[in-house]
């Protein structure tokens, strides 16, 4: 199935946490004939379509027609996490008769955008299971939490809003007498005894469904409003690109790979983030399973290429002065190639040319993004993955507004174009003279 704006809406609404992103992608892969491999098991030496999951990260590859040890990799990398408000380990508070859940900002969250929203809870419970531990996804889509704004009449300064993340972003969830703890309530909703919960990785999510909005063009809405576009839009586009790659073309000299990592928003320095050994170890095991050696693996990296797929800033109509004037970026105008001389993005001339060629072959326009020199620039998994693996890397994305807000905005028509460009990147022969 080709990537569509409706498909992205369904993907996001099904995936309120990084754990759910991996579960959603895994479900699609299993339905397409992929087989899940556990890292602790011996991997088969038969070429095929496989994926492996490490907590909130996943790597999938299609080596069904490519068993040769020198076939290069074509990789799309993205991240599964988004800035949000997470539940503290001991969250229960009683303040002025209100039952309060203490929350912690995750990543560069735009705090004010989370105020006065109906919030659900999602994440993972680690539960005692006999003599061991099992991990269960949890999702509550009822509006049980809300972070209330201060009334304007009580504000010290009505012209600006300053939020203290320790004092001002805790959520209310009731009044009066309450016997159970918040984690106990979540456990009960998940069908688990509270006493059996050994750990809880819980976070809030906005309950407003993703939506196609704006003026219609040929009967189709032009804009897509949703939470977590950064970076679930890239996870979805990369997943659809991998699934759409023609299997027969895999015998022409490459192995397409999708790698989606947790913890990008907090630096990627975790056991399953982009700074971990996850991608490099999976790639090496693919080579070893095909009968190759570590020498074959190291040689193979030099001919491989990675597209770090993360969302890009569209020029904001209300703040055009915050953007590089000679590099305007529009929504519904094609994928974005991101360049930064100080390597906040991993793109160089070689990889930029490769992605430009992929866009041409996909028949989609491409835009080029440069950040203002007088503003600090964010980064991606691109430089980290490139440094970890040595694989030539290009940073790309789709244009959006309101990045890191609880609710973000992108062009509806960019979804298909973005995925088509990534598919061409995975499937095109990008040889050099």
Curated annotation (Swiss-Prot):
One of the record's GO molecular function terms: metallopeptidase activity
GO cellular component, one term: cytoplasm
Entry keywords, A to Z: Aminopeptidase, Hydrolase, Metal-binding, Metalloprotease, Protease, Zinc
InterPro entries assigned to the protein according to its UniProt record, in alphabetical order: M18_aminopeptidase_2 (IPR022984), Peptidase_M18 (IPR001948), Peptidase_M18_dom2 (IPR023358)
Transmembrane segments: none
Cofactor entry: Zn(2+)
GO biological process: proteolysis
Residues the entry annotates as binding Zn(2+): 79, 153, 404
Keyword presence, Protease: yes
EC number: 3.4.11.-
Pfam families: Peptidase_M18
Family: Belongs to the peptidase M18 family.
HAMAP family in the record: Aminopeptidase_M18_2 (MF_00467)
PANTHER family: ASPARTYL AMINOPEPTIDASE
Full protein name: Probable M18 family aminopeptidase 2
This protein's encoding gene: apeB
């Amino acid at each position: 199935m080709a990537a569509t704006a409706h498909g992205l809406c369904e993907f996001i609404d099904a995936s309120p946490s990084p754990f759910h992103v991996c579960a959603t992608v895994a479900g699609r892969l299993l339905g397409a004939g992929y087989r899940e491999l556990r890292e602790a098991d011996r991997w088969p030496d038969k070429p095929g379509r496989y994926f492996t999951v490490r907590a909130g990260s996943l790597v999938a590859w299609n080596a069904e027609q490519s068993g040769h040890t020198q076939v290069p990799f074509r990789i799309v990398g993205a991240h599964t996490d988004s800035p949000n408000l997470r539940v503290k380990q001991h969250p229960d508070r009683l303040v002025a008769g209100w039952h309060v859940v203490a929350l912690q900002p995750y990543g560069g969250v735009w705090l004010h955008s989370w105020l006065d929203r109906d919030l659900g809870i999602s994440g993972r419970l680690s539960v005692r299971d006999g003599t061991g531990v099992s991990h269960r996804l949890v999702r509550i889509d009822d509006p049980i939490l809300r972070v209330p704004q201060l009334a304007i009449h009580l504000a010290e300064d009505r012209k600006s809003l300053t939020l203290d993340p320790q004092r001002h972003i805790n959520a209310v969830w009731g009044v009066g007498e309450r016997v159970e703890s918040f984690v106990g309530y979540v456990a009960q909703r998940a069908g688990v005894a509270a006493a059996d919960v050994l750990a809880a990785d819980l976070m809030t999510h906005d309950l407003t469904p993703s939506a196609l909005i704006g003026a219609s063009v040929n009967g189709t809405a032009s804009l897509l409003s949703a939470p977590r576009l950064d970076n679930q839009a890239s996870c979805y586009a990369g997943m659809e690109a991998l699934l759409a790659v023609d299997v027969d073309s895999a015998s022409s000299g490459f192995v397409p790979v999708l790698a989606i990592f947790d913890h990008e928003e907090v630096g990627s320095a975790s056991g399953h983030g982009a700074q971990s050994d996850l991608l490099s170890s999976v790639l090496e095991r693919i080579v070893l399973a095909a009968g190759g050696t570590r020498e074959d693996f190291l040689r193979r990296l030099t001919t491989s290429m990675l597209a770090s797929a993360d969302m890009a800033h569209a020029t904001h109509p209300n703040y055009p002065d915050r953007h590089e004037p000679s590099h305007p970026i529009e929504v519904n105008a094609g994928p974005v190639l991101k360049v930064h001389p100080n390597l906040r993005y991993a793109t160089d001339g070689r990889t930029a040319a490769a992605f430009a060629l992929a866009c041409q072959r996909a028949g989609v326009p491409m835009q080029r993004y440069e950040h203002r020199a007088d503003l600090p620039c964010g980064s991606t998994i691109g430089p980290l993955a490139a440094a970890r693996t040595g694989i030539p890397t290009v940073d790309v994305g789709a244009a959006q507004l309101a990045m890191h807000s609880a609710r973000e905005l992108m062009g509806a028509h960019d979804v298909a174009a973005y995925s088509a460009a990534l598919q061409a990147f995975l499937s095109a022969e990008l040889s050099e003279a």
